[in-house]
């Protein structure tokens, strides 16, 4: 009888071991996976939270050295936390990476992590990344720092410093072996720059300077990068080696004013910018009638473009409404109230909502209520809220869909300890 009991135990153990082995074997069949993450910086604290955008779970909290503005790379593989008060730019690996294979893209999903590489200097300011090259500006330095995203991910501090004549509040745009840099005001470098020039990576000027009085604001869309001036936009393209700059003057039909904040369209080539406190301007650099003004119901707080639904952009206004902009029609297509009013009176850097778009959702931070409002991008209706400790302020989204080939998918990158799917 004891022999029969032992046989049953051995049989049971063997079956359990077999099932366990099957459960941990990698799935070698291709799998379509979608992953989106939100990176949120607190307004007052040196903290960056990472949240799974699809279910609201917190994935990580990173302690940095000061309150941060957040910028992401084009690839989404890296996030840059620019801490002006601390004189440092921290680098974060988003944990989501894509590999282009022509007819499809593979996706790798890992845990987000704070990288060891930091960029340091006096008063870090504007961040620009294009085609895998990063240019970080420092208002208190006479050089901009340029490096590759791949070096950041490897922890390699392979930085090229490009001279910008004098410390000033400007910008650098990286172009392979060149950069476009702002020109400081020769009479008073504390005032806005007066133009832009092309330099090689040794700081030597290439070609003629481009006048751009009151330069402030920059963005890329398609193959064109734009800089805002009091007189119009500087449009930068690169056809062969060195980039070329041309000036697009404001239309004479526009009222007096200029844009000082620009965002570039995704999927369509256009730019959207501020034009006074309660108007925005749409710029199509390919059309003869390049500029269209849109009147807002109240003063603008923040605006973004929709990278998924290319014809839309979103503007949050101080009355607590999110306004959907139809870029093709040049008008507000619909509006929805999402928060209490956030007046633009007071300090320019008071805690006010910021917007990000991830997949089919729109996310609006509500810093005074310690939460993020989630809206469905199709119905344009509020669907849920995500609680975030402190004052969630600056926000960027990273993610997308791709194929996973079995063992390359890190299922441990997102823990669900308190619930099951």
From Swiss-Prot:
An annotated GO cellular component: periplasmic space
Keyword annotations from UniProtKB, A to Z: Chaperone, Disulfide bond, Metal-binding, Periplasm, Signal, Transport, Zinc
Keyword Signal among record annotations: yes
Residues of the signal peptide: 1-29
Primary location class: periplasm
Disordered: annotated segments: 399-421
NCBIfam families noted in UniProt: AztD
Subunit record text: Monomer.
Protein name per Swiss-Prot or TrEMBL: Zinc chaperone AztD
Organism name: Citrobacter koseri (strain ATCC BAA-895 / CDC 4225-83 / SGSC4696)
């Amino acid at each position: 009888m004891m022999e029969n009991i032992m046989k049953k135990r051995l049989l049971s153990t063997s079956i359990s071991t077999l099932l366990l082995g099957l459960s941990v074997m990698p799935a070698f069949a291709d799998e379509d996976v979608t992953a989106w993450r939100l990176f949120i910086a607190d307004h007052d604290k040196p903290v960056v939270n990472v949240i799974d955008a699809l279910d609201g779970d917190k994935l990580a909290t990173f302690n940095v050295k000061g309150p941060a503005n957040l910028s992401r790379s084009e690839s989404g593989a890296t996030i840059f936390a620019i801490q002006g008060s601390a004189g440092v730019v921290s680098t974060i690996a988003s944990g989501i990476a894509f590999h282009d294979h022509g007819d499809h893209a593979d996706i790798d999903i890992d845990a987000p992590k704070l990288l060891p590489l930091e960029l340091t200097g006096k008063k870090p300011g504007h961040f620009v990344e294009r085609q895998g090259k990063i240019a970080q500006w420092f208002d208190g330095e006479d050089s901009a720092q340029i490096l590759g995203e791949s070096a950041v991910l490897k922890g390699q501090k392979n930085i090229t410093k490009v001279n910008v004549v004098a410390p000033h509040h400007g910008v650098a745009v990286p172009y392979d072996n060149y950069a476009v840099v702002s020109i400081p005001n020769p009479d008073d470098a504390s005032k806005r720059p007066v133009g832009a020039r092309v330099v090689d990576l040794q700081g030597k000027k290439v070609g003629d300077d481009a006048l751009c009085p009151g330069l402030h604001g920059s963005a890329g869309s398609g193959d064109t990068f734009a800089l805002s001036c009091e007189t119009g936009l500087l449009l930068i393209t690169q056809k062969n080696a060195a980039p070329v700059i041309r000036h697009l003057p404001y239309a004479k039909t526009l009222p007096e004013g200029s844009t000082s904040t620009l965002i570039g369209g995704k999927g369509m080539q256009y730019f959207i910018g501020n034009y006074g406190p309660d108007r925005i301007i749409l710029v199509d650099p390919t059309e003869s009638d390049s500029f269209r003004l849109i009147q807002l119901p109240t003063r603008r707080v923040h605006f973004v473009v929709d990278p998924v639904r290319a014809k839309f952009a979103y503007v949050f206004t101080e009355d607590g409404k999110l306004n959907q902009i139809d870029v093709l029609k040049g008008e507000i297509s619909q509006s929805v109230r999402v928060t209490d009013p956030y007046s633009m009176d007071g300090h320019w850097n008071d805690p006010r909502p910021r917007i990000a778009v991830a997949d089919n959702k729109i996310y609006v931070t509500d810093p005074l209520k310690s939460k993020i409002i989630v809206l469905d991008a199709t119905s344009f209706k509020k669907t849920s809220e995500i609680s975030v400790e402190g004052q969630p302020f600056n926000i960027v989204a990273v993610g997308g869909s791709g194929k996973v080939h079995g063992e390359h998918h890190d299922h441990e990158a997102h823990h669900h300890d308190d619930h099951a799917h």
